Amino acid sequence: KNAEGQSFEMVWDGQIYDLDLWVIPKGSKNKEAALDFVAFSTATEQLAAQASWISYGPARASSEARIGTFHSDDSINMADHMPTAAANFGNALQNDFEFWADNADQLNERFNAWLSK
């Protein structure tokens, strides 16, 4: 059972992951503040700290070793619950944005037709 006494857990097998990024537009008025934010929000320690609240895999491999326990229960090792943990990432698929850009409309039509049956 999990921390709430429920008999279920997150399963990451077959997950689809995607990549994100931060952008500072050329000519930004607050460039220094934006750079400070990006440095803070992508820092190894910050990403590891975020993982104590929610099982989002940190964007930096350097954060993995620093992931601690769940913020309200020291008996739960959050590293085991990350989608990026070695045991959870073996069958992960990277989202193929080109495929979806080319096929989303057709597949959505087919899916909606199937749903309406």
Question: Residues of each region from the PLM?
Answer:
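Conserved C-terminal helix/tail region of periplasmic/extracytoplasmic solute-binding proteins
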Residues: 84-117
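Ligand-binding pocket segment of bilobal, Venus flytrap-like solute-binding proteins
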Residues: 1-13, 23
